[in-house]
UniProtKB/Swiss-Prot annotation:
Gene: miaA
Protein name listed in UniProt: tRNA dimethylallyltransferase
Gene Ontology MF annotations: ATP binding; tRNA dimethylallyltransferase activity
Site description Interaction with substrate tRNA, residues in chain: S104
Keyword ATP-binding: yes
Stated role: Catalyzes the transfer of a dimethylallyl group onto the adenine at position 37 in tRNAs that read codons beginning with uridine, leading to the formation of N6-(dimethylallyl)adenosine (i(6)A).
Family: Belongs to the IPP transferase family.
EC number: 2.5.1.75
Known partners and oligomeric status: Monomer.
Organism: Prochlorococcus marinus (strain MIT 9313)
Keywords carried by this UniProt record: ATP-binding, Magnesium, Nucleotide-binding, Transferase, tRNA processing
Amino acids binding substrate: T15, A16, S17, G18, K19, T20
Bridged cysteine pairs (disulfide): none
Chain positions covered by the region annotation Interaction with substrate tRNA: 38-41
């Protein structure tokens, strides 16, 4: 890896793979701050359901790109990229190594590969109309307008489905034909976590999310915002909302959240395999393995 450009580290992997724990260890060892690349952790008040780093963890290690907006104020990929690039530029000026951590593949790629997403601002009135149509209809519309995007986006992902339609209706072109790229001014070392016992880890974490107050957090969010809010239909929040509405009991919600999370993790694995080329940390000591790779990358 030529050392002509500064080094950026990215720690990626599917949900529940242990990224937060390893990120804290690496950040403390190397005296780094963390740039969040989890799309739901960008929103204020969505703490339990996104497994956002706790206040104590954020005191231990500085975190950026967390709690940027309220859940009813969507952040586009371009807006995220612009906010992240300001912090990255600051880190590079200070000669601090940027450290990205997260599992939102497209957001990671926007920073590591220099994607240029279309500059289409959110369209609140259109999103309201799409919300009234329902996610099933919206995904069918996206399938007709931009099959490539529809095949990449889960039929349950209302936020990304609406964004895809928003771009089509605003520009007359599919979003997938408008995403150019330009090489970023840094080298990238991608480290990947994908433990063999991921299914068990997902089951344990889902149970823990409910024990930590996911239903109560969802109830609070549903009082603050419309229950049709796309973020309240995402994994965990959607099932917790059904408990509040009397459509599921707690055990059913945990089982459904676990299943949806496992399906999501499978899609994440596919994305990382096709779109990224990380060094997969396979040993029993991921911290020491990661430190060795970082030291080698700095030479």
């Amino acid at each position: 890896m030529p050392a002509s450009k500064p080094l950026l580290i990215a720690l990626l992997g599917p949900t529940a793979s242990g990224k937060t724990c390893l990120a804290l260890q690496l950040a403390e060892q190397l005296k780094l701050s963390v740039l969040n690349v989890d799309s739901r952790q960008l929103y204020i008040g969505m703490d339990v359901g996104t497994a956002k780093p706790t206040k104590e963890q954020q005191r231990r290690v500085q975190h950026h790109l967390i709690d940027l907006r309220r859940p009813d104020q969507p952040i586009t990929l371009q807006e995220f990229q612009a906010a992240a690039q300001l912090i990255l530029a600051q880190k590079l000026r200070e000669q601090n190594m940027p450290f990205l951590v997260g599992g939102s593949g497209l957001y990671l790629k926007a920073l590591t590969c220099g994607l240029r997403p279309p500059a289409v601002p959110p369209q609140p009135e259109l999103r309201k109309q799409l919300g009234e149509l329902g996610q099933r209809t919206c995904h069918h519309l996206l399938q007709a307008a931009d099959p490539t995007a529809a095949n990449r986006i889960s039929p349950a992902d209302a936020m990304r489905t609406q964004r895809g339609l928003e771009v089509v209706y605003a520009t007359g072109k599919p979003i997938t034909t408008q995403q150019g790229s330009s090489p970023p001014p840094w080298r990238v070392l991608e480290l990947g976590l994908d433990p063999h016992n991921l299914r068990e880890r997902i089951g344990h974490r889902t149970t823990q999310l409910y024990a930590n107050g996911l239903i109560e957090e969802t109830e609070h969010l549903s009082h603050c915002y419309d229950t049709d809010l796309p973020l309240l239909q995402t994994i965990g929040y959607g099932e917790a909302l059904k408990v509040i509405q009397g459509l599921l009991n707690r055990e059913q919600a945990i089982a459904l959240t676990t299943r949806r999370t496992q399906q999501f993790a499978k899609r994440q694995r596919t994305w990382f395999r096709r779109q990224h080329h990380p060094y997969w940390l396979k040993g029993e000591e991921p911290l020491s393995e990661a430190l060795s790779l970082i030291q080698a990358g700095l030479r």
